[in-house]
């Protein structure tokens, strides 16, 4: 916090000086300034400045130049302070920001819950008999593979639509109101699921509920990354993964209860659907009182509201707090202005592919999130069904699922500790490497039909869940918030999540064919397939995924602009606020009567 203390003191001195000499000019300052382009003046893009020595009163333009350099210097100091801020200091300074971020991310509990109960329903006896068909060979009731695929496609298609609607909605009304609208529709669409009497009604309900889920997927990550400092970014973005796991654990517990008490009652599947009404109302009320993202407000030119929003995320009071707010707004403005100079247009989906820099950032973000599906994690979502098809009893299958989600929660907490010693890329790559090994072992056990091998394959799937939630699962939520530029963050995250959804659809279809007894009936041998796909994902990460740990958004922007290779991101040092030949005090006997000054665009 040394930089921050120095900056606060400097700001106080500057304020004091302005009070001592109100309306007066220093004798060495030039009389007036003529600029080439008035629009560039506001964007820190000063390419030519001329000083005339014939008078001594400073003009308004001269004040603008001073303000520009002060703002750039303040932004640099604020950026350095954020990068060097310890975790304890960040929590003490931004406790409200952390609390608001946790509240918004809690919306993901509902998506994790519902997607988990859908997979568990396929192993629930009452659900199988009411909506399934009987296998002529075994006499067992089962939901057909085509319907399992159809239901999965429905909610994922709904998420894709919801994600695409999220972009224009955020542009229009902001993050908070978009989330509140999504929560309202989720509560309304749940009625369709509760009163379902056919798989067709469930399909419609899943598709409609998928739209607000898509909104939650995008905004929880972007909101957490924009409202919190660098020291808290990893913890609060990866909390999204914890919310998924809490939802899945909640679902596993409810489904185990349904399997025990309501195995032959419609409450076995109606009660899990009804419990989705618990969270929308309290979450909507909490989000209504939450501050809007200051980055969104600055992009809209609403600077006073951005300052009010930042005040609500900071602790303390007095002039120090106001200085921190001003510094943060300056940093956000400088960052956004630098990005805007790359294009004069408002950020759109086409801008994500407009030039080489943005194409690279979009590609990495999309493939990074798609890696959550290609690493075999979709199999974890069908764990209860997998255990049953691997030969484990129905009751033990539900017990295994609960243990699996508990291990996932522990692994995510462990990743918070590991993030102090390992980077984002390290956790992503190590997790993939361990999963690859375990999947091949599961496939090998699937070649045996003994009771021990069946229990072993089920136990190892829990190991996959542990390594997944230690590495790739939590770190992806942080990476996808850091890779895009601030101007295109929401839209890039939407594209990335939709890429994940499309890949997940393909992976889900493959898994259902692999596990269904009427189709390929691979059982645990499917581990071979996912081991190969997981290894391919690891190769991509080694080649293309940069290390962003310890880098602020402005530094990441500069590294991408310079075209630094993925494996050199960590070691490359940049100064995003470099100023070339800044204007100095001008003597009145300047022989030419003019001085040129240049400021680096980026």
UniProtKB/Swiss-Prot annotation:
Identify one Pfam family in the record: Sugar_tr
Query: Cytoplasmic compartment: which residues?
Result: 1-106, 164-178, 222-234, 292-363, 419-426, 481-492, 547-602
- Give GO BP annotations, semicolon-separated: maltose metabolic process
Residue spans, topological domain Extracellular? 128-142, 200, 256-270, 385-397, 448-459, 514-525
Residue spans of biased composition, Basic and acidic residues class? 582-595
GO molecular function terms listed in the Swiss-Prot or TrEMBL record: carbohydrate:proton symporter activity
Show the segment(s) annotated as Disordered.
580-602
Protein keywords: Cell membrane, Maltose metabolism, Membrane, Sugar transport, Transmembrane, Transmembrane helix, Transport
Topology of the protein relative to the lipid bilayer: Multi-pass membrane protein
What is the induction comment? By maltose and maltotriose. Repressed by glucose.
GO cellular component terms listed in the entry, alphabetical order: plasma membrane
Task: Give the top-rank taxon of the lineage listed in the UniProt record for this protein.
Answer: Eukaryota
Q: Where in the cell is it found?
A: Cell membrane
Query: What residues form the membrane-spanning segments?
Result: 107-127, 143-163, 179-199, 201-221, 235-255, 271-291, 364-384, 398-418, 427-447, 460-480, 493-513, 526-546
Per its UniProt record, what PANTHER family does this chain match?
ALPHA-GLUCOSIDES PERMEASE MPH2-RELATED, PLASTIDIC GLUCOSE TRANSPORTER 4
Q: What does this protein do?
A: High-affinity uptake of maltose and maltotriose. Also transports alpha-methylglucoside, glucose and turanose but not melezitose or trehalose.
Q: Which family does it belong to?
A: Belongs to the major facilitator superfamily. Sugar transporter (TC 2.A.1.1) family.
**Protein's name in the database:** Alpha-glucosides permease MPH3
């Amino acid at each position: 916090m040394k930089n921050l203390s120095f900056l606060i003191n400097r700001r106080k001195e500057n304020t004091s000086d302005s009070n001592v000499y109100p309306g007066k000019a220093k004798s060495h300052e030039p009389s007036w300034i003529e600029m080439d382009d008035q629009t560039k003046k506001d964007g820190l893009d000063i390419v030519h400045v001329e000083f005339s020595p014939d008078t001594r009163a400073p003009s308004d333009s001269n004040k603008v130049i001073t303000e520009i350099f002060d703002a750039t210097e303040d932004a640099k100091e604020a950026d350095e302070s954020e990068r060097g801020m310890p975790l304890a200091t960040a929590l003490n300074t931004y406790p409200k920001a952390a609390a608001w971020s946790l509240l918004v991310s809690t919306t993901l509990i509902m998506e994790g819950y519902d997607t988990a109960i859908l997979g568990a329903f396929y192993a629930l006896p009452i659900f199988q008999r009411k909506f399934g068909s009987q296998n002529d060979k075994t006499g067992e009731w089962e939901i057909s593979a085509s319907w399992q695929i159809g239901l999965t496609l429905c909610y994922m298609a709904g998420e894709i639509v919801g994600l695409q609607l999220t972009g224009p909605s955020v542009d229009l009304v902001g993050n908070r109101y978009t989330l509140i609208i999504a929560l309202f529709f989720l509560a309304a669409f749940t009625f369709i699921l509760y009163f379902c009497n056919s798989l067709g009604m469930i399909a419609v309900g899943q598709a409609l509920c998928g739209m607000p889920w898509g909104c939650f997927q995008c905004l929880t990550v972007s909101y957490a990354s924009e409202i919190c400092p660098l020291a808290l970014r990893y913890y609060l973005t990866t909390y999204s993964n914890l919310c998924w796991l809490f939802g899945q654990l909640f679902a596993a517990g409810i489904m185990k209860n349904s399997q025990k008490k309501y195995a032959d009652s419609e409450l076995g599947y109606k009660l899990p659907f009804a419990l989705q009404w618990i969270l929308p109302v309290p979450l909507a009320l909490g989000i209504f009182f939450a501050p809007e993202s200051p980055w969104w407000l600055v992009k809209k030119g609403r600077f006073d509201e951005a300052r009010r929003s930042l005040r609500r995320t900071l602790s303390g009071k007095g002039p120090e707090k106001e200085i921190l707010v001003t510094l943060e707004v300056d940093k956000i403005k400088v960052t956004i202005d630098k990005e805007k100079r790359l294009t004069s247009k408002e950020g759109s989906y086409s801008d994500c592919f407009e030039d080489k820099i943005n194409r690279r950032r979009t590609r990495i973000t999309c493939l990074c999130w798609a890696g959550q599906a290609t690493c075999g994690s979709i199999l974890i979502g069908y764990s209860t069904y997998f255990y049953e098809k691997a030969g484990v009893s129905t009751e033990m299958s539900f017990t295994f699922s609960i243990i699996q989600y508990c291990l996932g929660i522990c692994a995510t907490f462990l990743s918070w500790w590991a993030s102090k010693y390992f980077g984002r890329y390290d956790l992503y790559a190590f997790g993939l490497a361990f999963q690859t090994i375990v999947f091949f072992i599961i496939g090998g056990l699937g070649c045996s039909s003994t009771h021990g091998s069946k229990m072993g394959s089920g136990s190892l799937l829990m190991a996959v869940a542990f390594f997944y939630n230690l590495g790739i699962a939590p770190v992806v939520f942080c990476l996808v918030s850091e890779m895009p530029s601030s101007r295109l963050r929401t839209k890039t995250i939407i594209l990335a999540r939709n890429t994940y959804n499309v890949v997940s659809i393909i992976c889900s279809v493959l898994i259902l064919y692999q596990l269904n007894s009427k189709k390929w009936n691979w059982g645990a041998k499917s581990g071979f397939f996912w081991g190969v796909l997981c290894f391919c994902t690891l190769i991509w990460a080694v080649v293309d995924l940069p290390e962003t740990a310890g880098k602020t958004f402005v530094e990441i922007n500069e590294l991408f602009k310079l075209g630094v290779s993925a494996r050199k991101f960590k070691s490359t040092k940049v100064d995003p606020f470099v100023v070339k030949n800044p204007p100095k005090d001008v003597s009145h006997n300047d022989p030419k009567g003019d001085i040129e000054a240049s400021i680096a665009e980026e």
